[in-house]
């Protein structure tokens, strides 16, 4: 038995290693050589080939397969003991080697057993193609996450695609074939013989557990997950991975792999908030808390502190902390959909869900506990997680891990204390409430009585609501009673299952109470009832509002303040759960973080073959836009944002989404490897002027600066795909309406135009109104060099010499056309289109820019109407007091328009006396600049 330095730490700790070397002295030389190199996939493949023998057939007989796999497992285990305890192997090498071993073992056993069965029964075949049909072997838990410990069992689920039968002389059904195959595989992997075993194998995570068939068809799995799948099964399927096992030549399981992933992802990662799921996850956390205590009592009171997996602050708690955020938020943030724990933790840190310091501490604790776990298992090749109680053995463990006993105990205690505290606060960390030592929110009616678990029929709740309405809404009782009757009589409510109806009965009185406490009680009550009727079929949202009274109160305040906000929430109930964490909703939007996370999430939207999942990507971008807009809306309604700041934020959001759209669409149209898009997206109109509203269209022009031969066709195709990406209605709605009519030659022109052609058009063919529009244009997204070139062209066009009188006539004529196109036959003042309204200010500003930018270059800058008017006043182009007054008037008009939009008004009109002073100021500006016709000729002295 050698005592060479590489073996010293391992021999001192591992009785298993000592016994193997005593029994096989020649093993020491082999091991000394093997432990000099990392245990990689290539190393395992070489060992497998060596152990199989030089003349081995491509598919080993089952008995030969059994022996080879057990010897391979011993090589891996012994080499890892030496490398790990000698400080040569990190955690990634250890768990990676064990996972590769499992993949090899399962794949090899599958091929061997399948060949024996096929020789008797023939091959199972796909019904549609007739091709051989593989069994789909799914690795669950740590096997799925590629993080097996060194003495782990493996959890498998066996699936297959089509029903049907084999093609041999003794035909059996595919179902029976895969069942027999599974049954015969198990001894090859888990039976203990003279060479030991490969892996203990557990099939109980399949649907129905031990009571169910050994192998399930994908259709049966789908029915099970949809109809009976439980929350702990979501947790189990999170790491599920299709293993690389293929037994039949000419088979192609890609379609089945895609089908499996299309079942797994929406089952595990739900797009919509689900209170039932949250409650089940809370219960799962309590089970984790209590599981070891029960086991400890059954084992004569073993202290749970000795179990580094199930005890307080153990590995299982770290797994729950990380996977909780994945389960709650992974449906909307695909970047969190990682099977590996550390990968998921890193993704959560990058997404801002886990503070940097906490993430580092969790990772350090995980690495420490996993290494300790492996050391415990190296000792006697046992699946144990119990720290030795004997002080001498404990000191030996510390030494094996490179610690002094006191330092080991201190480090262990620090890690476990941090993990335990974080575990208790896991739901707060995931953004789902405060510290969880407090009881769950009480399920009460608005009158304070506890919600009856078996409430009466709908007429009972109607009677209770009637009394509440007459008490709290006496002036509007009749109208509200009528609305209550229609709500309770609607098909959506009548068809609710009992559980949802009970929630509705709890929610409606609470909604009336919340509405009564707002600034517009009747409006709030009616709008809340509209919202509730819309979401009635989604029990998760009923539960959310019923179980979180603070959230319901926030919704009530929002809908009371703005019918437009009420409509927005009704159309996009996905946003409701963002109201749970009110503080987060009022944090300023970090556009750099939004862009980073969006890119990561879009990158993660992949089909099983690695191609981008375009539908998921398009929906994700829409969901992100809705969430960000809703965050701004909440801040807007609480008075946190001015109209100007809000428009800046909405415009920045649109720019960000345009840039990401280019990145996602370009690979779909470009076939030249390595080519980058030289496209500049030019924003006109409201987006160009950074005056975007919640529901504004995007006025865009696509310009390119690329000399490749197919540039015109390529960028036209890119423009079409971008427009479709932005404006197509998907299950998540439409991102933006897009208007491309401001491009050269309008609808008759090319969809994308070269910068040279754009410049030539602007110099020689553009109408004056197109130069007016150019004053508000800006580079918004795309190639920065092309964007800079556009800005230079724009500046050159704006400073061109012009016939002032002719320009004045054109501007007046265009203003008349706009008035004719927006007739106002009411007595109200249209704050945008009527004389003295916003359009007059915009036209005056554009006229001043086109007249004077050549001599006052500062006017070239796209600074917005208010800033440009002020600069014109400072330059003496208009009276400075009038410039400031007109800017203030324009700001007031915009604010009035915005408030009316929030009230759901289609046309922003007010009584004629309401904005009389502002209207008079704008009329004076118009008269001074365009009617008198003198300001354009000379500067004001």
From Swiss-Prot:
Q: Name one GO biological process term.
A: regulation of glutamine family amino acid metabolic process
- EC number assigned by the record: 2.7.7.89, 2.7.7.42
**Broad class of enzyme this protein falls into:** transferase
Q: Which residues cross the membrane?
A: none
Q: Which UniProt keywords apply?
A: ATP-binding, Magnesium, Multifunctional enzyme, Nucleotide-binding, Nucleotidyltransferase, Transferase
Cofactors named for this entry: Mg(2+)
Q: Name one GO cellular component term.
A: cytosol
Q: Which Pfam families match?
A: GlnD_UR_UTase, GlnE
What InterPro entries does this protein's entry cite?
GlnE, GlnE_rpt_dom, NT_sf, PII_UdlTrfase/GS_AdlTrfase
Catalysed reactions, as listed in the record: [glutamine synthetase]-O(4)-(5'-adenylyl)-L-tyrosine + phosphate = [glutamine synthetase]-L-tyrosine + ADP; [glutamine synthetase]-L-tyrosine + ATP = [glutamine synthetase]-O(4)-(5'-adenylyl)-L-tyrosine + diphosphate
List every stretch annotated Adenylyl removase.
Answer: 1-431
**Similarity section:** Belongs to the GlnE family.
| Name used for this protein in its record | Bifunctional glutamine synthetase adenylyltransferase/adenylyl-removing enzyme
* Annotated source species: Bordetella parapertussis (strain 12822 / ATCC BAA-587 / NCTC 13253)
Upper classification of the source organism reads: Bacteria, Pseudomonadati, Pseudomonadota, Betaproteobacteria, Burkholderiales
């Amino acid at each position: 038995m050698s005592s060479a330095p590489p073996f010293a730490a391992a021999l001192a700790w591992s009785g298993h290693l000592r016994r193997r070397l005593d029994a096989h002295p020649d093993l020491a030389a082999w091991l000394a050589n093997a432990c000099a190199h990392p245990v990689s996939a290539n190393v395992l493949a070489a060992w497998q080939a060596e152990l199989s023998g030089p003349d081995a057939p491509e598919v080993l007989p089952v008995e030969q397969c059994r022996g080879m796999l057990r010897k391979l497992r011993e090589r891996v285990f012994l080499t890892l003991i030496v490398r790990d305890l000698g400080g040569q192997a990190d955690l990634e090498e250890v768990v990676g080697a064990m996972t590769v071993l499992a993949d090899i073992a399962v794949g090899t056993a599958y091929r061997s057993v399948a060949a024996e069965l096929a020789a008797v029964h023939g091959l199972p075949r796909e019904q549609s193609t007739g091709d051989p049909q593989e069994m789909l072997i799914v690795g669950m838990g740590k096997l799925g996450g590629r993080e097996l410990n060194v003495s782990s069992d493996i959890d498998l689920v066996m699936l297959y695609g089509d029903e049907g039968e084999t093609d041999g002389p003794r035909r059996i059904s595919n179902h029976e074939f895969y069942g027999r195959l599974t049954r015969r595989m198990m001894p090859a992997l888990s039976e203990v013989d003279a060479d030991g075993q490969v892996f203990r194998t557990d099939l109980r995570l399949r649907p129905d557990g031990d009571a169910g068939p050994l192998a399930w068809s994908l259709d049966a799995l789908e029915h099970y997950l949809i109809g009976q799948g439980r929350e702990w099964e979501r947790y189990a399927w999170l790491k599920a991975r299709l293993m690389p096992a293929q037994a039949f030549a000419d088979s192609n399981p890609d379609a089945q792999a895609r089908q499996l992933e299309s079942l797994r992802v929406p089952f595990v990662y739900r797009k919509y908030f689900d209170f039932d799921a949250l409650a089940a996850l809370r219960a799962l956390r309590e089970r984790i808390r209590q599981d070891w205590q029960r086991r400890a009592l059954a084992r004569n009171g073993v202290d749970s502190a000795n179990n580094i997996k199930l005890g307080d602050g153990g590995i299982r708690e770290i797994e729950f902390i990380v996977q909780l955020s994945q389960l709650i938020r992974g449906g909307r943030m695909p970047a969190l959909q990682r099977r590996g724990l550390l990968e998921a933790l890193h993704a959560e840190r990058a997404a801002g869900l886990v503070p940097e310091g906490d993430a580092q501490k969790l990772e350090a604790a995980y690495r420490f506990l996993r290494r300790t776990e492996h050391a415990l298992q190296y000792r006697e090749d046992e699946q144990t997680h119990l720290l030795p109680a004997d002080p001498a053995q404990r000191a030996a463990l510390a030494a094996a891990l490179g610690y002094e006993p006191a330092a080991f105990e201190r480090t262990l205690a620090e890690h476990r204390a941090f993990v335990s505290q974080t575990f208790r606060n896991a739901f707060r960390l995931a953004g789902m409430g405060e510290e969880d030592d407090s009881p769950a929110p009480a399920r009460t009616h608005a009158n304070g009585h506890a919600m009856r678990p078996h409430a009466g029929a709908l007429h009972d709740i109607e009677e209770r609501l009637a009394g509440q309405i007459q008490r709290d809404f006496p002036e509007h009782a009749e109208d509200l009673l009528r609305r209550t009757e229609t709500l309770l009589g609607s098909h959506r409510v009548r068809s609710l299952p009992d559980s949802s109806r009970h929630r509705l009965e709890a929610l409606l009185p609470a909604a009336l109470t919340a509405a009564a406490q707002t600034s517009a009680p009747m409006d709030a009550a009616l709008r809340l009832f509209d919202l509730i009727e819309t979401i009635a079929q989604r029990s998760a949202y009923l539960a959310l509002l019923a179980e979180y009274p603070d959230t319901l109160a926030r919704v009530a305040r929002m809908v009371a303040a703005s019918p437009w906000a009420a409509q927005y929430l009704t159309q996009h109930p996905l946003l409701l759960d963002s109201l749970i964490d009110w503080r987060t909703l009022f944090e300023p939007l970090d556009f750099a973080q939004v862009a980073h996370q969006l890119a990561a999430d879009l990158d993660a939207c992949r089909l099983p073959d690695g191609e981008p999942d375009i539908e998921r990507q398009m929906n994700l971008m829409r969901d992100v836009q809705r969430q960000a807009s809703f965050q701004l809306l909440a801040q807007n309604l609480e008075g946190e944002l001015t109209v100007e700041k809000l428009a800046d934020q909405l415009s920045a959001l649109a720019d960000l989404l345009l840039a990401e759209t280019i990145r996602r669409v370009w690979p779909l149209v470009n076939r030249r490897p390595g080519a980058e898009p030289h496209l500049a997206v030019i924003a006109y109109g409201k987006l160009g002027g950074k005056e975007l509203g919640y529901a504004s269209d995007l006025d865009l022009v696509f310009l390119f600066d690329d000399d490749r031969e197919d540039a015109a066709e390529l960028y036209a195709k890119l423009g079409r795909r971008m427009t479709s990406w932005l404006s197509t209605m998907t299950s998540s709605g439409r991102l933006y309406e897009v208007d491309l009519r401001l491009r050269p030659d309008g609808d008759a022109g090319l969809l994308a135009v070269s910068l040279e052609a754009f410049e030539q058009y602007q110099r020689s063919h553009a109408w004056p109104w197109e130069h007016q529009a150019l004053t508000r244009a800006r580079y918004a997204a795309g190639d920065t060099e092309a964007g800079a070139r556009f800005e230079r062209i724009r500046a050159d066009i704006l400073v061109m010499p012009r016939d002032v009188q002719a320009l004045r006539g054109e501007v007046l004529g265009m203003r008349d056309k706009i008035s004719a196109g927006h007739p106002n036959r009411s007595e109200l003042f249209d704050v945008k289109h009527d004389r003295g309204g916003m359009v007059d200010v915009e036209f005056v500003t554009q006229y001043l820019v086109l007249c004077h930018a050549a001599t006052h270059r500062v006017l070239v800058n796209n600074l917005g109407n208010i800033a440009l008017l002020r600069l014109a006043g400072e330059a003496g182009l208009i009276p400075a007091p009038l410039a400031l007054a007109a800017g203030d008037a324009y700001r007031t008009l915009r604010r009035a328009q915005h408030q009316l939009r929030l009230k759901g008004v289609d046309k922003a009109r007010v009584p004629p006396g309401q904005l009389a002073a502002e209207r008079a100021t704008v009329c004076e500006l118009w008269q001074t600049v365009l009617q008198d016709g003198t300001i354009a000729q000379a500067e004001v002295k």
